[in-house]
Amino acid sequence: MIYIWICFYLQTTLLPCSLSTRTKFAICHNTSKLHRAAYKTSRWNIPGDVGSTPPPSKLHQALCLNEHSLSCMAELPMDYEGKIKETRHLLHLKGENDPIESLIFVDATLRLGVNHHFQKEIEEILRKSYATMKSPIICEYHTLHEVSLFFRLMRQHGRYVSADVFNNFKGESGRFKEELKRDTRGLVELYEAAQLSFEGERILDEAENFSRQILHGNLAGMEDNLRRSVGNKLRYPFHTSIARFTGRNYDDDLGGMYEWGKTLRELALMDLQVERSVYQEELLQVSKWWNELGLYKKLNLARNRPFEFYTWSMVILADYINLSEQRVELTKSVAFIYLIDDIFDVYGTLDELIIFTEAVNKWDYSATDTLPENMKMCCMTLLDTINGTSQKIYEKHGYNPIDSLKTTWKSLCSAFLVEAKWSASGSLPSANEYLENEKVSSGVYVVLVHLFCLMGLGGTSRGSIELNDTQELMSSIAIIFRLWNDLGSAKNEHQNGKDGSYLNCYKKEHINLTAAQAHEHALELVAIEWKRLNKESFNLNHDSVSSFKQAALNLARMVPLMYSYDHNQRGPVLEEYVKFMLSD
């Protein structure tokens, strides 16, 4: 069964935790070979035994043996369409008769990942609710739970609601009312709503701090089920987490509270069955492409982990099961980020890395002639693959994005080269210099620009959003990723203080700062970038970009899954999620 090799692969191959292995660059003075990999914690992999990947041939055999069983699983669950119709009918009834419960119903579809079936019904419910509740005066007559839920759903769907609606829950002292401390349900939803804040919305900062402190303080006195539910929401707020991951816990929260809960749970399970079969088929396609490419044979030390490459695409596009072609094609770009990262970390001398970068900048096969054969093969195959991706986009969407795609690879290799020069020079850059370069070397721009084009955006069609309109959104995601990468790798006990992470660059500039203070500063920067990301996401309120925006947010949302380390520096939470998405 495919479940067997997935479990084996998860146990022996460490899952990715960033879009670049550069958790840090080691400071060294050896310019003949830049063996930085020996000093660093992999950003793509949660630290552990990097030499334990199963032999490619065995993995490929395991995949091929299951093609027949996978094709059998691809059949739709019994009465799948009937369950969708039943749920749609229930949602319509609630939308007509119970405004508040209809919002709870909508939230449940989002949390369980089945909202894609009911976009029309959800939009109508939100439209009606917004028309009647957007005024702070009207909100005065609703509970904390109701106002918080309304606020969050509206902001998530591009409808502006002023944070002033929460002033109704403050007393004469200007602080949140004491009686709210007993409203656990309301406080949880207030905490969730505060995750949608923009910069400068002080009341939402107060709301987050107030709700978090009270809920944390009350956890010990809660019943087991409630304590587990509240703890999960504090750790993984819905807006900043992957819906399918948090939805597993929400399934328990529904309980028997609503008559539609059972139907919705059943549909979510059917959906998951369909998604698993699709993901497994896609993984076979990725494995076939990877093995036919054969680059891991040329690059003996390159990571032979198609499962990891695919994990990124699967999670980023988890909300859109119909985008199968995009997931497979995006995985190819992820694979080359891995490969080129290994080129810069393990293979090249500084002179060779300069030639490699120039060849990519020229996008010219002949510019690779003086490179070693393995580096030459990697560069030429990159050009072939990205040219092929561009051609597929042209055939499907009618425009050729090759210039945009080439630009991302040029920028990535140039950023990698900057790191190599830093490493060779033996000095750390300033914190700002580091962050500006590292947000590019993260690979986030490569992935998101390729995804943008694969989704048919930025073409010549009237009203299409332009790639430049997404730059601030991409920048915030890249910074969030970079900082979390460095925060996660800072747990590595082998760090010596000379590695190139943001924390060490920042501490170099603030010599009296403790490690804990530097850590807190980085967390504050992450929080600021989430506020900026919220605003940019809200401003990109264009129908054509909604799927891309959700996928981009999912890239940022992967972070809490990646950095839930155990004592072995593994990521059991991410492993658990991937198992859940791919196998029973």
From Swiss-Prot:
Keyword Cell membrane attached = no
Explain the induction of this protein.
Circadian-regulation with highest levels in early afternoon and lowest level during the night.
User: Which locations, inside or outside the cell, does it occupy?
Assistant: Plastid, Chloroplast stroma
Q: Which GO terms describe its molecular function?
A: magnesium ion binding; myrcene synthase activity; terpene synthase activity; tricyclene synthase activity
Query: Which co-factors does it depend on?
Result: Mg(2+); Mn(2+)
Q: Where does Mg(2+) 2 bind?
A: D341, D345
Entry-listed glycosylation sites: N30, N209, N322, N387, N468, N512
Where is it made, tissue-wise?
Accumulates at low levels in flowers; mostly expressed in both upper and lower petal lobes, and, to a lower extent, in tube and stamens.
Q: In which pathway does it act?
A: Secondary metabolite biosynthesis; terpenoid biosynthesis
Classification via Gene3D superfamilies: Farnesyl Diphosphate Synthase (1.10.600.10), Terpene synthase, N-terminal domain (1.50.10.130)
SUPFAM superfamilies for this protein: Terpenoid cyclases/Protein prenyltransferases, Terpenoid synthases
Report any one BP term from Gene Ontology. Answer: terpenoid biosynthetic process
The free-text domain note is: The Asp-Asp-Xaa-Xaa-Asp/Glu (DDXXD/E) motif is important for the catalytic activity, presumably through binding to Mg(2+).
Entry function:
May contribute to floral scent emission.
Record-given protein name: Tricyclene synthase 1e20, chloroplastic
What is the native source organism of this protein?
A: Antirrhinum majus (Garden snapdragon)
